[in-house]
From Swiss-Prot:
GO biological process, one term: translation
One of the Pfam families matching this protein, by short name: Ribosomal_L5
PANTHER family: 60S RIBOSOMAL PROTEIN L11-RELATED
Name recorded for this polypeptide: Large ribosomal subunit protein uL5
Subunit structure: Part of the 50S ribosomal subunit; part of the 5S rRNA/L5/L18/L25 subcomplex. Contacts the 5S rRNA and the P site tRNA. Forms a bridge to the 30S subunit in the 70S ribosome.
Biological role: This is one of the proteins that bind and probably mediate the attachment of the 5S RNA into the large ribosomal subunit, where it forms part of the central protuberance. In the 70S ribosome it contacts protein S13 of the 30S subunit (bridge B1b), connecting the 2 subunits; this bridge is implicated in subunit movement. Contacts the P site tRNA; the 5S rRNA and some of its associated proteins might help stabilize positioning of ribosome-bound tRNAs.
HAMAP family: Ribosomal_uL5_B (MF_01333_B)
GO cellular component, one term: ribosome
Single GO molecular function: structural constituent of ribosome
Family note: Belongs to the universal ribosomal protein uL5 family.
Domain of life: Bacteria
Amino acid sequence: MNRLKEKFQKEITPALMSKFNYKSVMEVPKIEKIVINTGVGDAVSNSKALDNAVEELTQIAGQKPVVTRAKKSIAGFRLREGMPIGAKVTLRGQQMYEFFDKLVSVSLPRVRDFRGVSKKSFDGRGNYTLGVKEQLIFPEIDYDKVSKVRGMDIVIVTTAKTDEEARELLTQFGMPFQK
């Protein structure tokens, strides 16, 4: 069993039950899934860029991403409906906990001038979104093989009903929020 999942069952669940006065263990919020999305703007003119992004996301997440396609045509961006413009991967279960552990303990501390993640990035429904400016913070990415520095969005979907519950859940998991 994963280190974080064990911590969730043994420490976090009882702590959240006492703090929010839950009557049942099933009421305790948990992390449902983590979605990693990267937009590849230059995929329109350069199809190799998308292949590189897919390769990097595969290394970071440990599973093959889905290529996302344009919903609408936008002439200003020289974009046709159905053109590939990005990649996303959804992690659940074991891989989700492993990725979250790696994100909190290894990757985020490698960000330059890191003072913690914003407390304001909750969506009002208990989900947390985090933007990463460069993929180099992940240990799997080899600096010499990177063709272009790409950012990504990491969305942590929880079963929490409010932002306060979700913030407490992520804090217990070790998410470094700003003071």
